[in-house]
Amino acid sequence: MTMRRRLGATAVAVALVSVASGCASSPSNAATVGNTTVTMKSVDDAVEHCSKFINPSSELTPRQIIASTVIRGAVAQEVLDKRGAKLSDAERDQIVARNGMAALDSDQVCHTMVRSFAGVFHLFDLEGDRKAKADLSAVDVKANPRLGSWDANNLVVQGSSSLSQPFTKTS
């Protein structure tokens, strides 16, 4: 085998391993949202602390609901950052209270998650449904296949994971 063929075979093997692994990013990342990384640890922590507040859904698991909420918060922040817009903690807290999410304030992890998610409501209030949905859907999101896939039209992680375990905790 010539050196050129060996290099070509090596490149193909590396590409196949990358594709077969199922993860374009680190397994410790839940998603890449624009220029922001959402960690699996942040999703794990939110699942552990906030699952008790989730109403069961026939379509999404509590983990997917919470992962979607965490990722939506990051998506909203990307849109706000792109515009140079700021949303203070006090404004976020008002949005949380106004939208019936104050029960989540009793747990610090859930409070942080819902405060981030308040950016979504702010954009809908500011821009109206159509424009906000278009802006949020336009943000590039790459979800870790262990969570499922990101549905930009509905702004949710859905479907089954590509791996046998939902995901592993990282230290």
Predicted regions and their residues:
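Short, low-structural-confidence N-terminal segments
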Residues: 1-61, 138-171
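A C-terminal, polar beta->alpha supersecondary segment
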Residues: 73, 77, 82, 109-171
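N-terminal targeting/tethering segments
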Residues: 24-113
